Design a protein with these regions (language model features):
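Short pre-catalytic strand/loop immediately N-terminal to key active-site residues, enriched for Gly-Thr
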Residues: 481
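Active-site entrance/lid segments in N-terminal catalytic domains of soluble metabolic enzymes
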Residues: 1-159, 170, 244-474, 639, ...
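Conserved active-site-proximal phosphate/metal-binding subdomains
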Residues: 25, 126, 139, 145-160, ...
């Protein structure tokens, strides 16, 4: 991808929710960004807003033409909107499903095309688009399957790309480092002073926390409940698209993304469009001013020292995969921290795994992955063995501070998954200091947030915490970012996001799972069978399957994943309590994971035995994250580790050099955005 675009185009601000707002769009242009008027349905309100915009905007502006716009291309040309004179749009953004074609307007304007996958991107390039808007799955309205973080990595094309979805100051900088030529904000602008948003909608936005959206027929919308929520007659794309809007929430679906919570934060911190555009621009400039982010990736970084190893890299616990001592040894031998997944193993199974791993590791750091939600008897049995054999580290998924404290008291440094800002604040107040921030790009159980909005939210919480607790507290904090990390580009982006924390002394590293499935050592050491690796390499998409109320897991499409709904329904017919259904489904997952990863299944007597590849393919659950869509070739652990550390640091340095030249950043300039972020 290329960054060949003007600095004016680095920050694109689209009027939110498919509503034309000339005042807001023109404010973006005046602030030095590219203000874009969403023409919505193309009704009289849109026509008047466009006419007003043409006379109001002193700087270049654009229009967005979504799937429901009734205006024709001819009406956008100057003089065709009912008011003679005024400026022409600088650019036209065609939304997914737009009735306009690139060729309809390419002779008059720069045409940017919104895309949600690689196929749409290639089609836009063939049609002659000037650039692409990578609309991640966390965005509001029509979306695809890949998050912004994953989609940007997937679009390795020689054409300018703007990232839309989950954009705040940290992720804006990361997107630019990752190769984007700019970023797009929309719902983030909704509560700023210039916005003319209806107060009822504004009130809904102020209460958002990022986990209150839902995918409905390929559209992300606000999940509203109660008698005032609109009734959706059919869960199909046309019906849902026709109900999108922000004028009457009793009859319309608000097309807001996971980043909707940022609207309140932007309004609180910056207040108006001018300060917001400057803050985003300054965050990018500050990110490339020095090598703080790159240093976090190199040998001997703060996280490396905290781990007691060479690299700031952890291999995430993977049920029925990272349960082999030989695989843990291979990970540790190349300088990373391996984690053995205990999942639902009983006491005897836990002992067998950990005794072998303990002996193999010979005093080197290693860890265990535990489920904080596992049945109490299983947790108790596992804890007895863990306390006895004392791995150096632990990760507790769905855990609580009390569980972490019990392990810490045994001398085991313990990380908690913190899946929301609310939980993170609770954990910090309880004294926890080691966290995993896992975006929904991961394989297996995932939370409601994709990486970009989650990391933007969680790092802001930590920065606020440090501002009140004092800078000395930074030395206690250790943070692992997970989800979609697998190569130079992705690790460089993650390091850029975390750079403000790194600069304050927080230890930051990356945690990977799916990337290890592509390594030769995963097969050689029995972590997975060759078929599992072939399935991962061939994956073109991932799917989410429901594991319990409010819980989903990411995997590769397979016969089992397609039939899963029926098996879940069978458990519900038995009228089990929800907690029992969740436990039974987790056991089912473990059994099917074993078939997929180890080629072992139970026979008619219940005993484990080897199964052939046909049964493995038919009955297996192939858990993997969105990285499976981004990779196709095998690698080695050594090459993987190099790519996300030294390779990523070098990548970041090269990108920073290019961006400093483009943005005319001097290394001796005083940073601006860091102080703004801490306000």
């Amino acid at each position: 991808m290329t960054s060949a675009a003007s600095n004016t185009e680095m920050i694109i601000g689209i009027t939110p929710f498919g509503e034309p707002d000339a005042r807001l769009a023109s404010a973006v242009s005046r602030a030095g960004g590219l203000g874009v008027l969403d023409l919505g349905t193309g009704d009289q309100n849109a026509r008047e807003a466009l006419a007003h915009m043409r006379h109001l905007a002193p700087r270049p502006f654009g229009v967005r033409v979504g799937a429901r716009c009734r205006l024709s291309p001819e009406e956008i040309v100057a003089g065709k909107t009912g008011m003679e004179g005024g400026a022409e749009p600088h650019a036209v953004i065609l939304g997914i499903g737009s009735p306009w074609q690139v060729g309809d307007v390419a002779a008059h304007f720069k045409v940017l095309v919104e895309v949600a996958d690689l196929e749409q991107a290639l089609e836009a390039v063939r049609a002659g688009a000037y650039g692409l808007v990578a609309r991640g799955s966390e965005s509001g309205g029509r979306v695809g399957e890949l998050s912004s973080f994953a989609l940007l990595q997937h679009l390795r094309l020689d054409i300018p790309v703007w990232v839309c979805g989950g954009i705040g100051p940290r992720t804006a900088a990361a997107s630019m480092v990752g190769g984007a030529c700019g970023v797009v904000v929309d719902s983030q602008l909704a509560l700023l002073a210039e916005s003319e948003l209806d107060e009822a909608v504004a009130a809904e936005l102020r209460s958002m926390d990022g986990s209150d959206t839902v995918l409905m027929a390929g559209h992300r919308v606000l999940h509203r409940r109660g008698p005032s929520a609109p009734l959706v007659p059919a869960d199909d794309p046309e019906t849902v698209a026709a109900m999108l809007g922000a004028r009457d929430l009793s009859t319309q679906l608000l097309p807001v993304g996971q980043d909707g919570f940022l609207a309140a934060r932007f309004a609180e911190r910056w207040g108006d469009v001018g300060r917001t555009v400057r803050a985003l621009t300054d965050a990018v400039r500050d990110a490339v001013r020095d090598d703080v982010a790159a240093q976090a990736l190199r040998d001997g970084s703060a996280m490396s020292r905290a781990f007691g190893i060479r690299l700031p890299v952890a291999q995430g616990p993977m049920t029925q995969v990272s349960d082999q001592a030989g695989f843990a040894d291979a990970v540790a031998a190349d300088g990373a921290l391996p984690f053995v997944a205990l999942a639902l193993a009983n006491g005897a199974q836990t002992r067998a795994m950990l005794v072998e791993t303990h002996a193999t590791m010979s005093g080197r750091p290693w860890g265990v992955g535990m489920l904080g939600s596992a049945p109490e008897d299983i947790q108790s049995a596992q804890l007895d063995v863990v306390r006895e054999l004392k791995p150096t580290h632990a990760i507790v998924a769905s855990g609580r501070p009390s569980q972490a404290q019990a392990l810490e008291q045994a001398g085991i440094r313990t990380f908690l998954h913190a899946s929301s800002p609310v939980l993170l604040r609770e954990f910090l107040e309880a004294g926890a200091c080691r966290f995993v921030f896992k975006g929904s790009e991961c394989g297996g159980p995932v939370g409601p947030w994709s990486g970009f909005p989650l990391w933007e939210a969680q790092l802001a919480v930590l920065e606020d915490f440090l501002s009140h607790a004092g800078e000395d507290s930074a030395q206690r904090l250790e943070v692992l970012l997970a989800g979609g990390v697998h190569n130079e580009r992705s690790a460089a982006m993650v390091a850029t996001i975390a750079a403000p924390l790194t600069a304050r002394g927080v230890a930051v590293g990356v945690l990977m799972g799916t990337a290890y499935l592509f390594t030769e050592e995963a097969v050689e050491n029995g972590a997975i069978q060759p078929l599992f690796q072939r399935q991962v390499r061939a994956a073109r998409r991932t799917v989410l399957i429901r594991t319990a109320a409010g819980h989903v897991a990411r995997c590769i499409p397979s016969p089992f994943s397609r039939d899963y709904v029926e098996q879940e329904a069978e458990l519900k017919v038995e009228t089990m309590p929800e907690c029992r259904i969740r436990t039974e489904l987790e056991r089912l997952h473990v059994e099917r994971l074993r078939i997929a990863s180890k080629g072992e299944g139970r026979d008619s007597t219940g005993a484990l035995s080897q199964v052939g590849e046909e049964r493995q393919l038919t009955e297996g659950l192939f858990v993997a994250g969105e990285v499976a869509v981004l990779r196709s070739a095998t690698t080695t652990i050594s090459a993987l580790h190099h790519s996300v550390t030294e390779g990523a640091a070098d990548f970041l340095t090269r990108r920073a050099d290019l961006l400093r030249e483009r943005l005319r950043v001097g290394a001796d300039e005083e940073p601006i955005a860091a102080s703004v972020l801490r306000r």
